[in-house]
Amino acid sequence: MGPLSARLLMQRGRPKSDRLGKIRSLDLSGLELLSEHLDPKLLCRLTQLQELDLSNNHLETLPDNLGLSHLRVLRCANNQLGDVTALCQFPKLEELSLEGNPFLTVNDNLKVSFLLPTLRKVNGKDASSTYSQVENLNRELTSRVTAHWEKFMATLGPEEEAEKAQADFVKSAVRDVRYGPESLSEFTQWRVRMISEELVAASRTQVQKANSPEKPPEAGAAHKPRARLAALKRPDDVPLSLSPSKRACASPSAQVEGSPVAGSDGSQPAVKLEPLHFLQCHSKNNSPQDLETQLWACAFEPAWEEGATSQTVATCGGEAVCVIDCQTGIVLHKYKAPGEEFFSVAWTALMVVTQAGHKKRWSVLAAAGLRGLVRLLHVRAGFCCGVIRAHKKAIATLCFSPAHETHLFTASYDKRIILWDIGVPNQDYEFQASQLLTLDTTSIPLRLCPVASCPDARLLAGCEGGCCCWDVRLDQPQKRRVCEVEFVFSEGSEASGRRVDGLAFVNEDIVASKGSGLGTICLWSWRQTWGGRGSQSTVAVVVLARLQWSSTELAYFSLSACPDKGIVLCGDEEGNVWLYDVSNILKQPPLLPAALQAPTQILKWPQPWALGQVVTKTMVNTVVANASFTYLTALTDSNIVAIWGRM
């Protein structure tokens, strides 16, 4: 399709007319239009146009100054749009469709909400559902930028040139003012720049009024946003909600047990944590009465920059997967699959090349559960871009390989672990996965853990029948393999065959495992154990320490580790979080295991309010912290996500 012509517009316009100025509705969908085909000089003649359909084309941007000031309905679905700021030229827009533009993210949705205060519907849904989210973000950013302005102005000397100082302020605000999740950083920095420039402009108008410093006017008042979050592409068979109902529970003050001072073993002082948010975001049918949905797994999104840390966590349970910002407690995304029960989630980061040759970083979330399907979610764009029919039975757990960002392990109740290569999305932004290996197990695999020192060579799994290891090197000819070594945790006739339902590497050598003995978590050396195996198929682990845990006989409480901080975490049957600082063991492993070590501290269940009563007790199925240990997320058996923050 070449450039548009007046004749084509009259052919596809309604009502039929030989004058462009009388057309009120125009359908330009499916014409393979490029951005340069939209001629502002031609389109501005559509002075009465109220409805425009540009769906199913190849548009990367919308030209400025199209002159369609009366436009009320705009459809831009299934294009290649990467920016939405040009939409501000349509101040009367009421309905907007943007689904199927894979490079638009939640940041663009928020920009749309801010720029178009008259919007009523986005992608066919009520656009006012997330009003409070954008409003709260804007209010907090305005407050922080204003405080930064006052601090900045107080440091200026009288001799400093005002123009240069004000330009420096805008740069420093964009660099230093932070709020909200990393996934919203594009929107927040965009707003910070706008607010900063408004403050600078306001200060210039006041220079002649007074010499004494005054508090800057409320920034952004002329652009009070309508906070509406647009939901992007949704598969027809699996609805996606980007504006889930979120129920926060008020909580009395939490009780924390454990000494907050340095121990005699030389460990660091215990960190202080406080409960921040309690969310019911996995409720069946979005019912606030649901205190029964079991939540099973959570994982923090990988940081976008090396050395940084993430505050965005994915949680799963029931028929929903949620992505939550730990700082604000906002549910950023919610993916629902009716009839599914999600058991596991895992993140990876992929570099995708667009049709225009640009590179984009995608955070991809894999989620799986009862139906044996793996769903690959492009979280920031908000849609499912692939489904792997991985197993005929339920998937208990999954994880990505640290060595290969596209390699995904899935472990199922069919007693198989399969290694997949999910690849990178094609031009239609769909994954085409291929199967690389099948690993047979003698019992149901519960936890997967690539060996930290050689993740592309060995895989550990905690199973109903014990702890096993497989050779996963891809340069070997066999594509179906059995367990190479089984690890046992004690001597005697009952040494093997015991469930291992918790497994994590604390560093490249030391493994934390749970389930082999009641009331204990075992720390053992991979290097020493593997080095002493010889040709044996059953090997006793070299135990370095045993950590005291709950004496419950209940199973399936998953443990996790925070390697950067030398911390091991595990929930229990009463809603508590057991925290162990094992940094001293990592620095100097003991020659012989010492006596059972007590936890560094126990975070007692804070007993939040729900349905007008206190939730006095629950089971914490899993607990995970981000790399810097600033946030901790605990998932319960009673549909409550508990988020703790470091004080």
Swiss-Prot record:
GO terms for cellular component: centrosome; chromosome, telomeric region; cytoplasm; intracellular membrane-bounded organelle; kinetochore; nuclear origin of replication recognition complex; nucleolus; nucleoplasm. The modification Phosphoserine is found at residues 212, 243, 251, 259, 264. GO terms for biological process: chromatin organization; DNA replication initiation; establishment of protein localization to chromatin. Keywords: Centromere, Chromatin regulator, Chromosome, Cytoplasm, Cytoskeleton, DNA replication, Kinetochore, Leucine-rich repeat, Nucleus, Phosphoprotein, Repeat, Telomere, Ubl conjugation, WD repeat. InterPro entries: Leu-rich_rpt, Leu-rich_rpt_typical-subtyp, LRR_dom_sf, LRR_LRWD1_dom, LRWD1, WD40/YVTN_repeat-like_dom_sf, WD40_repeat_CS, WD40_repeat_dom_sf. It comes from the Eukaryota. GO terms for molecular function: chromatin binding; histone H3K27me3 reader activity; methyl-CpG binding. It is found in: Nucleus; Chromosome, Centromere; Chromosome, Telomere; Cytoplasm, Cytoskeleton, Microtubule organizing center, Centrosome. Ubiquitinated; undergoes 'Lys-48'-linked polyubiquitination leading to proteasomal degradation. Ubiquitination occurs within the WD repeats at the end of the G1 phase. Ubiquitination may be catalyzed by the CUL4-DDB1 E3 ubiquitin-protein ligase complex and other E3 ligases. Residues 204-267 are annotated as: Disordered. Its main location: nucleus. SUPFAM superfamilies: L domain-like, WD40 repeat-like. The keyword Nucleus applies. The entire WD repeat region is required for the interaction with ORC, CDT1 and GMNN, as well as for association with chromatin and for binding to histone H3 and H4 trimethylation marks H3K9me3 and H4K20me3. PANTHER family: LEUCINE-RICH REPEAT AND WD REPEAT-CONTAINING PROTEIN 1, OPTICIN. Required for G1/S transition. Recruits and stabilizes the origin recognition complex (ORC) onto chromatin during G1 to establish pre-replication complex (preRC) and to heterochromatic sites in post-replicated cells. Binds a combination of DNA and histone methylation repressive marks on heterochromatin. Binds histone H3 and H4 trimethylation marks H3K9me3, H3K27me3 and H4K20me3 in a cooperative manner with DNA methylation. Required for silencing of major satellite repeats. May be important ORC2, ORC3 and ORC4 stability. Belongs to the LRWD1 family. This is Leucine-rich repeat and WD repeat-containing protein 1. The gene is LRWD1.
